[in-house]
Amino acid sequence: MKTLVLVAVLGLASLYLLSYASEVQQISRDEEDFRALMASFGGIFDTEERGVDKEGCRKMFGDCWGDGDCCLHLGCKTRKLPPWTDKPYCAWDWTFGRK
């Protein structure tokens, strides 16, 4: 009787280990499928620096000589709104989204 109980417990333990191992393999397969799915979207979910469209562009309140000097969604303003400036500066040009 004791031997039968011992064999049953060992059998259940081995079944538990086998099912756990197959579950771990299934999770790793699911992770690979998820990564492949995310890669197929072509970078939609990649983060990118907002508002910078070219190397060396002027950021908010930076000096400028024309709209081409400022970063995306910024324009060169000549009005002296900030009291500390006496020359043109880059400020928001009231646009949204991508140009």
UniProtKB/Swiss-Prot annotation:
InterPro entries: Huwentoxin-1. The keyword Disulfide bond applies. Residues 22-50 form a propeptide. It is found in: Secreted. Residues 1-21 form the signal peptide. Its main location: secreted. It comes from the Eukaryota. Disulfide bonds join 57-71, 64-76, 70-90. It holds the Pfam family Toxin_12. The presence of a 'disulfide through disulfide knot' structurally defines this protein as a knottin. Belongs to the neurotoxin 10 (Hwtx-1) family. 25 (ICK4) subfamily. Ion channel inhibitor. This is U11-barytoxin-Tl1a.
